From Swiss-Prot:
It holds the Pfam family ABC_tran. Belongs to the ABC transporter superfamily. Methionine importer (TC 3.A.1.24) family. ATP binds at residues 38-45. SUPFAM superfamilies: ACT-like, P-loop containing nucleoside triphosphate hydrolases. This is Methionine import ATP-binding protein MetN.
Length: 347
């Protein structure tokens, strides 16, 4: 449904040029909810604005529903944009118009008749839970209700794609959860493809099917959400995950960690495992079969869209041979193992 091929965006020229996007390839299938995360200034907003050509790429192709938007003339692009709804962090509602009239606005601009506008707006108000707010004005609404109006307005042209630019970052956690539930509901009922950018891992965890990680204008990692939470492939991905899960070794231990193993050290590991493995007596089996003692420093279980994920930080205490055997045993059971460092046994 959405395909970016070698998309780059550069502002300015010469030594002062800013390369906001660098050769981005992205493929979002029809009906998917695809998240893009990254730090502030990484290029997330530029990327999503390139999808509907609010920002025209310096190079590369943007293909939506089989149409290359970068090659369309102004009139064809205007028509294509009807297939691309968009919501933002700020709701951008017209204060002088009611909820109904805000949702109706794009249809008025498209020249839709008043009777057809009513037939299209009322179901959207029902879908977004705003039927009883139809005659109210934005000043009478909460933040979450305003975002629901923005979503309904974005759906008025019956788009095939919804672009979400930090759509929940101005909302409190409870309201964020309700908006995410609404987006999931829209995805299921309408088959809408959703591309969202965010810096909030909770958003990715809650509704995304796949996630991409952008850093300094480059898409450095992309994976199914379950795989990303289990085994992020990059250091930045691990940093995002650990900060979200609050799963870091105690500071006193961090200060003792050494990068390389020695004859009198033992490893400190972060383990991630999912599915049936979560329910197995992992630690007792490991101690029995490999001969190591296991000191659990932190552990937690998360549910990622119905998939159970177990996470643990532990010291494996034993000789180099037994700890090596333990690591091999863990990996043989499809457990993702990250060695954080090594500590002296007599410390």
């Amino acid at each position: 449904m959405i395909k970016l091929e070698g998309v780059s965006k550069t502002y300015g020229a010469g030594p002062t040029a800013v390369h906001a996007l660098k050769n981005i390839d992205l493929d979002v299938p029809q009906g998917a909810i695809h998240g893009v995360i990254g730090l502030s200034g990484a290029g997330k907003s530029t990327l999503i604005r390139c999808v509907n050509l609010l920002e025209r790429p310096t190079s590369g192709r943007v293909i939506v529903d089989g149409q290359d938007l970068t090659r369309q003339d102004a009139e064809a692009l205007r028509q294509s944009r009807h297939q691309l709804g968009m919501i933002f962090q700020h709701f951008n509602l017209l204060a002088s118009r009611t909820v109904f009239d805000n949702v109706a606005l794009p249809l008025e601009l498209m020249g839709v008749s008043k009777s057809d506008i009513r037939e299209r707006v009322e179901p959207l108000l029902d879908l977004t839970g705003l039927t009883d707010k139809a005659r109210q004005y934005p000043a009478q609404l909460s933040g979450g209700q305003k975002q629901r109006v923005a979503i309904a307005r974005a759906l008025a042209s019956r788009p095939k794609v919804l672009l979400c630019d930090e759509a929940t970052s101005a909302l409190d956690p409870q309201t964020t959860a309700s908006i995410l539930e609404l987006l999931q509901d829209i995805n299921r009922k309408l088959g809408l493809t959703i591309l969202l950018i965010t810096h909030e891992m909770e958003v990715v965890k809650s509704i995304c099917h796949r996630v991409g990680l952008i850093s300094d204008g480059e898409l450095v990692e992309e994976a199914d959400v379950g795989d990303f939470f289990t085994a992020p492939a990059t250091r930045l991905g691990r940093d995002f995950l650990n900060a979200f899960l609050e799963l870091e070794p105690p500071q006193a231990l961090v200060e003792r960690l050494e990068e390389t193993a020695g004859p009198h050290t033992h490893p400190v590991v972060r383990l991630a495992f999912s599915g049936a493995t979560v329910a197995t007596p992992l630690i007792s089996r490991l101690a029995r079969d490999s001969g190591v003692d296991v000191s659990i420093l932190q552990a937690k279980v998360e549910s990622i869209q119905g998939r159970t994920l177990g996470l643990m930080i532990a010291e494996l205490i034993g000789s180099p041979d037994t700890t090596s055997r333990a690591l091999t045993q863990l990996e043989a059971h499809d457990i993702n193992v990250e060695v954080l460092g090594h500590v002296q046994r007599d410390a």
